[in-house]
């Protein structure tokens, strides 16, 4: 029996998307009679009916390719049940186009928002399997997401390269690393890159403690310091605020970001020349690492196995060294934060790295 599989990629792009698409398709072709439908630009394509029949040869040569051959877009979950000015019922449209494409199932590749919408569609009666994609590594019930380790490699390389210029000029360097809610990327890259100070959203910092750490290194004859700062890092005052109040305070501050504020405060408080480096979207671009190619492929193959067995409403993930699946309803709407007592946090502290608190 032929199974028609719709595939979409949603949210921010990251390395490994094409490898995962390839994994789903090639495993499906090998295990059963499959037809693959490529849905363009994420959930927007499912809403607007933008899709195309995929040929087998389109899945060749994409294992190492960054980005996504299907395109992507951000369609916030909070708007999915909201009928806007265009008078479009998004959920109704997605269900209608699912039927119009004659799909047997839908495979979604994305982060937390993607999983929430995937769960919504599952609850609406569609057959859905979701794969965990994000450089933030913050999806619930999976030890790792594809794209994360490639981003760690990139951010680590940035920190590595800053060591030489920081040492040459005797400067303190603040590296702003992606991660608005969860600090996994900053934690891993900071430790791998030999950062002296690591600031995460989960551990509110005290700027005086940060300055003390920089001054202590200077007094010990260290000509420079490296700070790995998550874009969502916050000080203790901000941490005590409500979410809306904190957002308003951030919008009103005279700095481009929290990293720029920290750099200015270091210069003002202890007179140490400080520069900010923001690698930005470089962290989510380019070819996936060997690790992410293998991980993405394994996730894709597992999705095909679930489709073969008729098991839907599932989110694929990793537990230890094993690829597993969990009910979407248990994954959607939850975020995997860095625990303050995590072994890697403890290791950083025991090495004398300042965590800002």
Set out the residue ranges of the language-model regions:
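Short glycine/serine/threonine-rich phosphate/pyrophosphate-binding segments
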Residues: 13-24, 46-47, 88-92, 103-119, ...
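Alpha-helix capping and helix-loop boundary segments enriched in small/acidic/polar residues
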Residues: 12-15, 85, 112, 142-150, ...
């Amino acid at each position: 029996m032929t199974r028609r599989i719709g595939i979409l990629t949603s949210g921010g792009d990251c390395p490994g998307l094409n490898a995962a698409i390839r994994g789903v398709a090639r495993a499906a072709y090998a295990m059963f009679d499959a037809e693959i439908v490529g849905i363009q630009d994420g959930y927007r394509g499912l809403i607007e009916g933008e899709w195309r029949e995929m040929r087998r040869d389109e899945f060749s040569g994409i294992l190492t390719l960054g980005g996504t051959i299907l395109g992507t877009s951000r369609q916030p979950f909070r708007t999915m049940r909201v009928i806007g000015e265009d008078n479009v019922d998004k959920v109704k449209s997605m269900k209608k186009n699912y039927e119009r494409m004659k799909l047997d199932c839908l495979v979604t590749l994305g982060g937390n928002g993607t999983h929430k919408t995937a769960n919504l569609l599952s609850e609406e009666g569609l057959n859905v399997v979701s794969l965990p994609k994000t450089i933030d590594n913050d999806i619930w019930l999976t030890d790792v997401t594809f794209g994360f380790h490639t981003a760690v490699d990139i951010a680590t390389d940035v920190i590595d390269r800053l060591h030489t210029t920081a040492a040459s000029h005797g400067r303190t360097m603040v590296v702003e690393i992606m991660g608005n809610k969860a600090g996994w990327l900053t934690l891993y890259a900071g430790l791998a890159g030999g950062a002296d100070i690591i600031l995460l959203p989960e551990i509110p910092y005290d700027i005086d403690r940060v300055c003390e750490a920089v001054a202590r290194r200077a007094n010990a004859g260290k000509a420079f310091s490296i700070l790995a700062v998550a874009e969502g890092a916050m000080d203790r005052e901000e941490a005590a605020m409500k979410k809306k109040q904190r957002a308003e305070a951030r919008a009103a501050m005279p700095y481009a970001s929290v990293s720029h504020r920290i750099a200015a405060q270091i210069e003002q408080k202890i007179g140490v020349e400080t520069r900010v480096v923001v690698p930005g979207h470089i962290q989510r671009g380019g070819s996936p690492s060997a690790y992410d190619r293998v991980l993405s492929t394994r996730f894709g193959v597992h999705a095909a196995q679930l489709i073969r067995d008729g098991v839907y409403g599932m989110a694929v993930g990793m537990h230890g060294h094993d690829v597993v699946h969990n009910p979407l309803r248990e994954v959607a709407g939850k975020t995997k934060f860095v625990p303050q007592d995590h072994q890697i946090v403890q290791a950083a502290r025991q090495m004398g790295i300042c965590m800002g608190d």
